[in-house]
């Protein structure tokens, strides 16, 4: 069946490479570019009063009325000199930032980054997407964390992150308005600092700029396409064009053991041979045949 699986619709420059995972997961869309939907330095709504806000049960949901909340550019906190908006010392703070997604179909992946002191829980359209490990399942408004956690970015570090694939993106994002809501908690009532710097970035199929630039420290993750099939000894891999003209093929050999690979050398034109050093995402020309 020469139509079993098609390569993703991307343009490869000359002499470039692409790695396909034979996982059976059938994920062909990979990002053409990354942009930020939400950045820490955007303007956020925040609540740090001594008592809970009105309609507290729905504070993290889209459509919640936060008109009487304070506003400020992030990060929002105190101490460490990593805050654009400095607040009075507090056990906790609630943050909200509404943003627009033009077309969810153009987003293949999401990455959420969290730089925090001391604990947090993040929600996207009311669904929890990431949390620190030092808070209870449903923390009270002024609950303290069970341990300390120091922010990373102010000393040159990289924030923690979690990545979401295409199926998860479809469950989390909406066309139009979306809300990122985050609660940040301190470890003690007399803590010298509180930090909340959060970023939500998207992998886009479109090469056209639509949102915000990614932060300078952002390193795009390696996202590989996954074929709809797996491989087993004796099966044959065939590459053909859309007219079913075969370009190349190979049967999976018996002798293909861990730490060996099989391919042509030089790349794409020489004889088939076993390589004693597999080179995924790299040329075969550096391997010993």
Regions found by a protein language model. Give the residues of each.
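Short proline/glycine-enriched turn/loop motifs at strand-loop junctions of beta-rich domains
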Residues: 115-118
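Intrinsically disordered, low-complexity linkers and terminal tails enriched in Ser/Thr/Pro/Gly
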Residues: 1-109, 121, 129-289
């Amino acid at each position: 069946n020469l139509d079993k699986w098609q390569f993703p619709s991307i343009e490869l420059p000359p002499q470039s490479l692409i790695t396909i995972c034979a996982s059976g997961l059938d994920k062909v869309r990979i990002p053409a570019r990354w942009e930020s939907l939400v950045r820490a330095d955007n303007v956020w709504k925040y609540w740090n009063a001594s008592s809970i806000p009105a309609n507290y049960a729905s504070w993290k949901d889209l459509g919640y009325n936060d008109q009487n909340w304070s506003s400020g550019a992030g990060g929002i906190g105190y101490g460490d000199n990593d805050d654009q908006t400095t607040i009075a010392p507090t056990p906790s703070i609630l943050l909200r930032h509404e943003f627009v997604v033009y077309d969810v179909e153009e987003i293949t992946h999401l990455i959420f980054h969290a730089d925090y002191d001391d604990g947090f829980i993040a929600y996207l359209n009311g669904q929890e997407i990431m949390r620190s490990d030092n808070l209870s399942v449903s923390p009270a408004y002024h609950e303290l964390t069970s341990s300390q956690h120091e922010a990373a970015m102010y000393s040159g570090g990289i924030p923690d992150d979690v990545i979401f694939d295409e199926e998860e993106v479809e469950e989390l994002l909406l066309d139009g308005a979306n809300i990122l809501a985050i609660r940040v908690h301190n470890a003690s009532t007399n803590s010298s600092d509180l930090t909340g710097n959060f970023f939500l970035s998207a992998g886009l199929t479109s090469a056209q700029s639509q949102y915000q630039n990614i932060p300078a420290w952002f390193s795009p993750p390696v996202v590989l396409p996954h074929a709809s099939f797996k491989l087993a000894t004796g099966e044959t891999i065939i590459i053909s064009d859309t007219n079913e003209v075969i370009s190349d093929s190979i049967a999976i050999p018996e002798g293909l053991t861990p730490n060996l690979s099989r391919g042509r050398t030089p790349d794409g034109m020489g004889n088939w041979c076993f390589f004693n050093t597999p080179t995924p995402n790299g040329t075969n020309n550096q391997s010993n045949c």
